[in-house]
Amino acid sequence: MMSRKRWLALIAAAMLFVASAAISLVSSPAVDVDEWVGTGTSYKQTIVETGTDFGKSIAILELSGVIQDTGSAPSLLNTGVYHHRDFLKQLEKAGEDPNIAGIILQVNTPGGGVLESAEIHKQVEEIVQDSEKPVYVSMGNMAASGGYYISAPATKIYAHPQTITGSIGVIMQSIDISGLAENLGIEFNTFKSGPYKDILSQTREVTDEEEDILQTLVDEMYDEFVRVIVDGRGMSETEVRELADGRIYTGSQAVATGLVDELGGLDDVIESMKEDLGADYNVIRYEHSLGLYDFFSMSTNRLLSPSYELQSIERLLNQSNTPTLQYLYAE
């Protein structure tokens, strides 16, 4: 049973949220009721620049943080964290919306999972090829490894001179604690169905045969990374492989090598897209929007589960213990 204080806290928070949301609803452009309640799409469109040509808009989508599908949904406490499923939905909606003339991806990431990067890349490629909408990338402080992978199929790529990009390659890591365990007198008993069932186990060294197996996986994903750049940037495979040794590049260096089209910030990207479209459209930003359903769902979880945060931390730790292939730049 929840205590009286918890019920009062929930009611007070709900009243505050409803009042704040009502003010926001009145002062904002018209918004779909389903979206506001939280039963429809999970984003809102905010006008950031008003144009003189009406009818269509340019959409800005922000990708910030490690590209990883943590499985958690956005909440009041983690709206600043990257949410993979939510970003894919936003990208899909922007691609399908006939009122969106072009898309700008604001990218600031060291990369992340191979699968997650491939999912974003696929959607960007489909928008450019099937919808015939221009997709421009505006790189921030960092757009490395998976950050470059998802940018490769874009119509144009912009970066600041100081942007860190590149890091083209694949990495897979694990920790070997067998030596430490031996010093501490700890023994591990493993029963397995095949010789490679516990490959990359932390409790023993990797064998030569296992190194060969793992390297073939890394090489396969690396070849895919190279292909993505060849197709997206119109470069030869030889050119790409010379650049794709894992090193990082500044934005200026990336322009010189052909990995990036032009230097410039977000304002430059917006201006360039307007010129290429031949229209001064409104510029809108897609942002996650917490509706009433999201709020009450999150609040209920927190109140009914005292260990809610601990469960999230435990899930994250369990994920980090599992070696995965990554397009990730690790500083």
From Swiss-Prot:
Matching NCBIfam families:
SppA_dom
Give the record's GO CC terms. plasma membrane
Q: Which InterPro entries match?
A: ClpP/crotonase-like_dom_sf (IPR029045), Pept_S49_SppA (IPR004635), Peptidase_S49 (IPR002142), S49_SppA_C (IPR047272)
Cysteine pairs bridged by disulfides in the record: none
GO biological process terms, semicolon-separated: proteolysis
Give the domain of life: Bacteria
This protein's species is Halalkalibacterium halodurans (strain ATCC BAA-125 / DSM 18197 / FERM 7344 / JCM 9153 / C-125)
Enzyme Commission number(s) from the entry: 3.4.21.-
GO MF terms here are:
serine-type peptidase activity
**Keyword Hydrolase appears in the UniProt entry:** yes
Q: How does it assemble?
A: Homooctamer, assembles into a ring structure with a central cavity.
Membrane topology term reads: Single-pass membrane protein
Entry's family note: Belongs to the peptidase S49 family.
Q: Which UniProt keywords apply?
A: Cell membrane, Hydrolase, Membrane, Protease, Serine protease, Transmembrane, Transmembrane helix
State its location(s).
Cell membrane
The residue ranges crossing the membrane are 7-27
Q: What is this protein called?
A: Putative signal peptide peptidase SppA
Gene name, Swiss-Prot/TrEMBL: sppA
Q: What does this protein do?
A: Digestion of the cleaved signal peptides.
Residues at the active site: S145, K197
